[in-house]
């Protein structure tokens, strides 16, 4: 069967043939992969910035944003059946008995760093025709979300952040009314999203859905499909080409929440200065190797203390976040069908996957499909 693999030692990315996997344990399922989303992590792995093959292997099959169809189940699997659509989770727990998070099924909060991640660290990914995995890591997706369900995994980043926000926002007046659900926690608050890529735009949809007044700050200028999506969901778009970070507060007013989705350290620090009193700053992007920057850490820390600010780093996602992403994606598709569809580029067949991954992006979210013509 076909797969896209990275060979770190020889610095190659290529389409390979490998044996089709078989079920060996009663709690496993076999999944035919349908769509694989390509993100910045995949591109960085293909540029050999990181990525770790499984033990004993000289290559890593990439791909972690995935949608598949169950084709076979083990004897002990009762909650899934052939024909079901599933989105798999990415991270697998470490083996340390003392890691409370992994033992509780929350490996997204692993305390040891010895987790594995499909397609990223120590385990092959999903950019291959078939996968066998434990059924517990499969999230059931309704068939009517078939065309957009590959967006579930990138949406989980925002869902995890939003779930944590609900507790953090209770720490300060005006406290959230206990009668107000987590899905309405943004009412009366202003959010700024940094970046108009898939994670940023999906995060903006989640914030709009939670009733935040939402601004998106990125480098694109009109005409651009990202700006069209921002406007379609009722967010206000601001371009960094015409509005420097130093003027954000004057333009927007007090910023209650910053949702960072760019992985650019200088921009992140510049925008931190614009965070309002009692504000929360959520970091989701992972900065790559960048040139050294000048900063005044004393001033930043002083402002954080004097303004009661919180900076939160968040990575990966747990079972709750996948469930929330599936539910919210259905809501987004109902509220903004055109905007959700606009996130998806034309699907690329597996035979052209390497060229697509190594080349310029096509649309907002590149998708490799095993069913593309």
Model-derived segments and spans:
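C-terminal hydrophobic helical "lid"/dimerization subdomain
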Residues: 1, 269-272, 318-373
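Glycine-rich beta-strand-centered segment in the early N-terminal region that forms part
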Residues: 21-36, 51-100, 142-144
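Residue-level "contact hotspot" at macromolecular interaction interfaces
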Residues: 22-23, 59, 79, 151-154, ...
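NAD(P)H dinucleotide-binding glycine-rich loop of Rossmann-like/cofactor-binding domains
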Residues: 95-190
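Hydrophobic/small residue at the entry helix of a nucleotide-binding pocket
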Residues: 157, 199, 222
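Adenosine-nucleotide cofactor-binding segment
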Residues: 175-179, 183-196, 208-270
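Glycine-rich phosphate-binding loop and adjacent beta-alpha segment
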Residues: 265-331, 370-373
